[in-house]
Amino acid sequence: AAEQRRVLPSLGRAPQAVINGNEAIGLGLARGGLEAFIAYPMTPVTGLLHFMAHYAEDFGFTVVQPESELAVMLMSLGMAYAGRRAAVCTSGGGFCLMTEGFSLSGAAELPVTVVLGQRPGPSTGLPTYTSQSELHFALHAGQGEFPRLIVAPATPLEAYEWSPAVLGLSWKYQVPGVILVDKTLCEGSFSTDAGEAMSLPVYEVAAWDGASPYKRYARTDTGVSPLAFPPLPGEAVKVDSYEHDEAGLTTEDAAETVAMQEKRLGKLVQLEHEIELLPAVKVTGPAEATTALLCWGSNGPVCEE
């Protein structure tokens, strides 16, 4: 039989990778030095768990699927206590179960990176559709006040860029970070040139200088306490979900409580300065336009078009 073929014209550029948002996040986290990935499968980020498990040996990190989202969050905080950079992924319902642990991250100043894939709620909602309904949830998740970092990439390239930034900043400032995505980005495939990714600074972690006794929550000018990890001969590395003093011992003293709350919230100033150094906002279109369209996440390219 005759065979008819159509030759497509060359685009005049180098070939690009075709990847989805989940894969881009995974590659970005690996780029940022991830050491452990913990998750319980939930649409639309199940593909991320599969991707990380498939390439765990190649990238040299640990992948664990425990029994629930509660275990996911607490296991990641335990790894952070031991000095391992961990990330988790979930969707809205799973993040509901994680919120107490998310607040523990804020109180104990244990870094964790959460990939939160949005889908329509409430409750189970429409698990195979896309949504952008959980920005306020991420901003206010967890009891009490504590700093957190949230980014909402619009494309796989931005997901690849910002995932290591969240991981690094979360560790530098010892705060929880959220990569807020949705089904459209997570499971949509895009032509992507990773060579266009922004370069990131090296986010140094404040290390303990060896002065005894070790104070896990030592108050500093930046609010960031020096980190040390067990086992530490002759020293105790104590973290606490209760309000605590510099050594990590539980306290109900009013002055100490105020000082610790101000210490934690004081990190926001430094964190905001770090974000200002990065291209966190993308502006397109004519500069003389009288109307601006503000958008975030996967709606960005749609609005831009």
Regions found by a protein language model. Give the residues of each.
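Flexible, low-complexity linker and terminal segments
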Residues: 3-32, 167-305
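Broad hydrophobic/π-residue packing in well-ordered secondary structure
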Residues: 36-40, 81, 160, 167-169, ...
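Short, well-ordered, mixed-charge alpha-helical segments that flank or form enzyme active sites
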Residues: 47, 122-123, 158-159, 186-189
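Conserved thiamine diphosphate
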Residues: 129-178, 182, 204-209
